[in-house]
Regions:
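Helix-to-loop junction immediately C-terminal to a conserved catalytic motif
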Residues: 56
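ABC ATPase NBD Q-loop/coupling interface
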Residues: 65-82
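Conserved ABC ATPase "signature" region
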Residues: 119-137
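Conserved ABC ATPase signature
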Residues: 142-146, 150
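Conserved catalytic motifs of ABC-family nucleotide-binding domains
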Residues: 163
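Catalytic Walker B motif of ABC-type/P-loop ATPase nucleotide-binding domains
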Residues: 167-170
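Conserved ABC ATPase "signature" C-loop
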Residues: 221-222
């Protein structure tokens, strides 16, 4: 797949040239293939939110370049509005941005500003509402009468209705209960699968990143510390912990097993993968194979009796 995002040596300074100047991004370079689902993680202040606001031109690089679909984002500043239809950005607590009289009008706001005809707008509103699991009976109600989770759905649907080729979400499940969190993120994943939209998801939840993303970008001290597949990034758990981050709970369990000398992989990061790995280990043991990790294996600390 071709790269839909290419970032070259991006740096960004707040208040440049002033005594209170602050570097928010420092020489950041990476690419994203079209159709990828990239999780972005990092400690508070690492540069995550500043990075994603560059993806649709809300911030202009102090230095470096950003290419969206092969085009320099800032080559023609007067055309920056066109890129904002290509890259949809959902901020934290997007329901605070709701303002229209009805949910329908709020979802239709973006498509209307794209200059689409009424039939296409109506089609997009209903499609987006369906993607986020919003009951059509709610479309004519005021968004301010809805629950927090329903408001969040309206806000996300408003971005989806513009059919961006890139969907960027900054903690879209923040503040929701576990059930609401799973519903929102599952709907985003389903949207990604059905439309092929490239997704960038900022999250503090390692479980969410492990479950939904196929690649992970790790920010630390305004730079990219890691950028690889989910498997390879979470296999580097000790390095993530050194950066002040965590790993999925199931990964911690398997790392502990390796510390105890049990021969299991270090890159187990989801429950289904854990179940598959445990069943495979049981089959090996039932076949008479030892599950003792060799002493010279990475993270190994000798054997365990009874394995």
């Amino acid at each position: 797949m071709a790269d839909i995002i290419k970032v070259e040596h991006l740096s960004y300074i707040y208040n440049p040239g002033m005594p209170n100047a602050v570097t928010a991004l420092d020489d950041v370079s990476f690419t994203v293939e079209e159709g990828d689902f990239v999780g972005i993680i990092g400690a508070t202040g690492s540069g995550k939110s500043t990075l994603i606001t560059h993806m649709n031109g809300l911030n202009k690089p102090t230095s470096g370049k950003i290419y969206i679909d092969g085009r320099d984002l800032w080559a023609e500043p007067e055309k920056i509005r066109d890129f904002r239809f290509l890259t949809g950005l959902v901020f934290q607590y997007p329901e605070y941005q709701l303002f229209e009289e009805t949910c329908y009008k709020d979802i239709a706001f973006g498509p209307k500003n794209m200059g689409l005809d009424e039939a296409e707008i109506d089609k997009r509103v209903h499609e987006a509402a369906a993607f986020v699991g919003l009951d059509e009976a709610l479309l004519e109600r005021s968004p301010f009468e809805l629950s927090g989770g329903q408001k969040r759905r309206v806000a996300v649907a408003g971005v989806m209705a513009m059919k961006p080729r890139i969907l960027v979400l900054d903690e879209p499940a923040a503040g929701l209960d576990p059930e609401g969190r799973d519903e929102i993120l599952s709907e985003v994943k389903e949207y990604h699968k059905k439309t092929g939209t490239t997704v960038l998801l900022v999250s503090h939840s390692m479980e969410d990143i492990a479950k939904y993303a196929n690649r992970v970008l790790v920010m630390s001290n305004k730079k990219i510390a890691m950028y690889d597949t989910v498997e390879k990034v979470f296999a580097r758990a000790p390095e993530l912990l050194e950066l002040g981050l965590s790993v999925p709970q199931v990964t911690k369990i398997f790392l502990k097993l390796r510390e105890m000398g049990v021969d299991v992989p270090a890159d187990v990061y989801t429950i289904p993968y854990a179940v598959k790995t445990i069943l495979a280990a049981k089959a090996r043991r039932d076949a008479g194979e030892s599950l003792v990790l060799p002493r010279d294996a990475e993270n190994g600390k000798g054997g365990v009796s009874g394995c």
